[in-house]
């Protein structure tokens, strides 16, 4: 029973951490432990560590940490790429060394030795494609082609010049401070890829996420079948029920079978738990980015719209406060009337109307052309189509 509760607690803690990390910043979790855990994982832990280093080693220690942070987070570097290769290689090596001796088994055939290796190779190829493909770098030679791909919405995108590159900024583009270049349909800079994710390599990035989710899921299920096969081949259930008198119910057998598996095949159990957690994380990332692709939105635009709604909310609140203050000052000189009493309520109502209006504008996405067309733009970027080249030529003429 203790093992059973330990596994339940472990699963609940893992689920809490995963949800907090992925979704803790959502408005629905505001003021909850999920938000605090998200802050601690993303900012708080590093902030406390920086303060500790400053307290122990002074400003010199802090400067060293900040210089390491600048190299790791603010400049292109292959650190996370090396970590990815190390994780991929070591996980496959440990899986092959600990589990391939049980293939073929009761549930798995010999073919899985080769399909697993092939799946890993495909994953590495997709990783390399995403790392070294052009995300859609905008320069003086091709800027007209990217400008003709998407119109300006004059809300979050308007005609302006990049202050660094000194070229016109196409709609949906952004200057990446890490790569020091403008990227068309900029989504985000991915440290794992050491590359930006933009118009021309989003399809590789999505394929990478989907394939690695399936790869980790495949590994989890395969190891599960190997362990189930060992339980069947060694007649563990029969031994427990006949020789140890354990009741045949699932509730009685499950904790003891799990305890036996953890003690006998601990490496496989650890690998299975690790792959299950990673597959859950990858499923969350893929679902998030798939939703962005289906609605023709980018991560960068999501933050831009959030800032736009927040700014409009603050402006409407400021206007309502100013109007209420003005009404209050006038009421000091005049006898309060029914009109002045409800003025504050009307002011709050108009502020709410402004918020709703800003939210409605944000939901009217100029670039959303329907799910099928949106996905086709990911697979076949607009700037690479002949129609886009013809438009840019006509504009230049």
From Swiss-Prot:
Supply the PROSITE patterns for this chain: DHHC (PS50216)
Q: Could you tell me what this protein is called? A: Probable protein S-acyltransferase 17
Tell what the record comments on domains. Answer: The DHHC domain is required for palmitoyltransferase activity.
Q: Which UniProt keywords apply?
A: Acyltransferase, Cytoplasmic vesicle, Endoplasmic reticulum, Lipoprotein, Membrane, Palmitate, Transferase, Transmembrane, Transmembrane helix
> One GO term of the cellular component aspect?
endoplasmic reticulum membrane
Q: Where in the cell is it found?
A: Endoplasmic reticulum membrane; Cytoplasmic vesicle membrane
Q: Which residues cross the membrane?
A: 2-22, 37-57, 83-103, 117-137, 207-227, 269-289
Q: Where is the DHHC domain?
A: 160-210
The EC number(s) this enzyme carries: 2.3.1.225
Superkingdom as given in the UniProt entry: Eukaryota
Q: Which family does it belong to?
A: Belongs to the DHHC palmitoyltransferase family.
Which reaction equation describes what this protein catalyses?
Answer: L-cysteinyl-[protein] + hexadecanoyl-CoA = S-hexadecanoyl-L-cysteinyl-[protein] + CoA
Per the record, the gene is PAT17
* Disulfide cross-links: none
- Gene Ontology molecular function, alphabetical: protein-cysteine S-palmitoyltransferase activity
What is the scientific name of the source organism?
A: Arabidopsis thaliana
Q: Which GO terms describe its biological process?
A: positive regulation of response to oxidative stress; positive regulation of response to salt stress; protein targeting to membrane
Where do the catalytic residues lie?
A: 190 (s-palmitoyl cysteine intermediate)
**InterPro entries tied to this protein:** Palmitoyltrfase_DHHC, PFA4/ZDH16/20/ERF2-like
**Topology within the bilayer:** Multi-pass membrane protein
**Broad EC category:** transferase
Q: What does this protein do?
A: Palmitoyl acyltransferase.
């Amino acid at each position: 029973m203790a093992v059973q509760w330990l596994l339940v607690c472990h699963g609940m803690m893992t689920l809490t951490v995963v949800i907090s990390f992925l979704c803790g910043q959502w408005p629905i979790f505001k003021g909850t432990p999920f938000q605090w855990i998200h802050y601690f994982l993303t900012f708080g832990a590093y902030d406390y560590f920086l303060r500790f280093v400053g307290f122990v080693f002074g400003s010199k220690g802090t400067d060293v940490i900040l210089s390491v942070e600048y190299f790791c987070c603010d400049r292109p570097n292959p650190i996370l790429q090396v970590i990815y290769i190390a994780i991929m290689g070591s996980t496959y090596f440990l899986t092959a060394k600990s589990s391939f001796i049980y293939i073929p088994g009761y549930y798995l055939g010999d073919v899985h030795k080769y399909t697993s290796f092939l799946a890993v190779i495909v994953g590495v190829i997709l990783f390399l494609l995403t790392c070294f493909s052009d995300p859609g770098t905008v320069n003086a030679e091709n800027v007209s082609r990217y400008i003709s791909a998407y119109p300006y919405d004059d809300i979050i995108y308007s005609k302006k010049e990049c202050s660094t590159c000194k070229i016109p900024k196409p709609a949906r583009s952004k200057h990446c401070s890490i790569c020091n270049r403008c990227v068309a349909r900029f989504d985000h800079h991915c440290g794992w890829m050491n590359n930006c994710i933009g118009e021309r390599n989003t399809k590789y990035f999505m394929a990478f996420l989907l394939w690695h989710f399936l790869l980790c899921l495949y590994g989890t299920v395969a190891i599960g079948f190997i362990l189930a096969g060992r339980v069947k081949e060694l007649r563990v259930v029969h031994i427990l029920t006949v020789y140890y008198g354990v009741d045949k119910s699932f509730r009685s057998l499950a904790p003891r079978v799990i305890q036996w598996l953890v003690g006998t095949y601990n490496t496989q159990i650890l690998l299975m738990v690790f792959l299950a957690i990673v597959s859950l994380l990858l499923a969350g990332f893929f679902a998030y980015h798939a939703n962005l692709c289906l609605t023709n939105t980018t991560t960068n635009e999501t933050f831009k719209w959030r800032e736009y709604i927040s700014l409009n909310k603050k402006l409407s609140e400021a206007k309502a406060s100013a109007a209420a203050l003005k009404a209050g000052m006038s009421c000091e000189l005049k006898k309060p009337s029914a009109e002045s009493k409800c003025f504050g309520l009307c002011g709050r109502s108009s502020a709410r109307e402004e918020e709703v209006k800003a939210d409605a504008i944000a939901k009217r996405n100029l670039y959303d052309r329907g799910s099928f067309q949106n996905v086709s733009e990911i697979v076949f970027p607009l700037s690479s189509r002949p129609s886009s080249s013809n438009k840019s030529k006509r504009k230049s003429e």
